[in-house]
Amino acid sequence: MATPHINAEMGDFADVVLMPGDPLRAKHIAETFLEDVREVNNVRGMLGFTGTYKGRKISVMGHGMGIPSCSIYTKELITDFGVKKIIRVGSCGAVRMDVKLRDVVIGMGACTDSKVNRIRFKDHDFAAIADFDMVRNAVDAAKALGVDARVGNLFSADLFYSPDGEMFDVMEKYGVLGVEMEAAGIYGVAAEFGAKALTICTVSDHIRTHEQTTAAERQTTFNDMIKIALESVLLGDKE
């Protein structure tokens, strides 16, 4: 039945949901890549859709910005609508010079300055990692599509406008590939409620060089990332 944030019924969502931050990007993904699309959520403007990709039922829905927002939606999708796999498809900022604008990054793990997972994990550090099979399927899908995807750690930040520029040096030293705001929270929710999760990001801006894509490009041109996510779902069905 409907929750305070999702006005859908059991069965409206597929067992796999792709989740961008922007609900308009969710609409674009549904209209561009899925067939037989229908809207299944519009509460607070957080649009959700279900359709088929190559005959496979798949849903796509926005999760908003930051760990608090995405944690609400992912928790409800898992516990109230039977969703088994979450694939975040979003943008990130690069901190390493060998990571370029529009590179695709597969988030094997996610560091964070948020305390959300410590609260969940009784004030201990929780290793926020993606599901291994989902990582492997995304890597295989990228190879099949001819996309040179990077695999490694992301950093999920609580602050978009961070005053601590020195932290970027620490991230670079530790090999962090990109900075975003949700992966660690989504991985924590998935672990807590017995689901599986993965984050795939496209580099939308470079923190070192100040290169950036436009808002319109972020909404419509990150197609490689979406194709990798969708094809990885099909590979997962063969396991």
From Swiss-Prot:
GO terms for cellular component: cytosol. It is an enzyme of class 2 (transferase). Phosphate binds at G21, R25, R44, R88, V89, G90, S91. The active site is at D205. A purine D-ribonucleoside binds at H5, E180, M181, E182, S204, D205. The record marks R218 as: Important for catalytic activity. Keywords: Glycosyltransferase, Transferase. One of its GO terms (biological process) is purine nucleoside catabolic process. InterPro entries: DeoD-type, Nucleoside_phosphorylase_CS, Nucleoside_phosphorylase_d, Nucleoside_phosphorylase_sf. Its EC number is 2.4.2.1. GO terms for molecular function: purine-nucleoside phosphorylase activity. It catalyses: a purine D-ribonucleoside + phosphate = a purine nucleobase + alpha-D-ribose 1-phosphate; a purine 2'-deoxy-D-ribonucleoside + phosphate = a purine nucleobase + 2-deoxy-alpha-D-ribose 1-phosphate. CDD domains: PNP_EcPNPI-like. Homohexamer; trimer of homodimers. Belongs to the PNP/UDP phosphorylase family. PANTHER family: PURINE NUCLEOSIDE PHOSPHORYLASE DEOD-TYPE, URIDINE PHOSPHORYLASE. Catalyzes the reversible phosphorolytic breakdown of the N-glycosidic bond in the beta-(deoxy)ribonucleoside molecules, with the formation of the corresponding free purine bases and pentose-1-phosphate. This is Purine nucleoside phosphorylase DeoD-type. It comes from Salmonella newport (strain SL254).
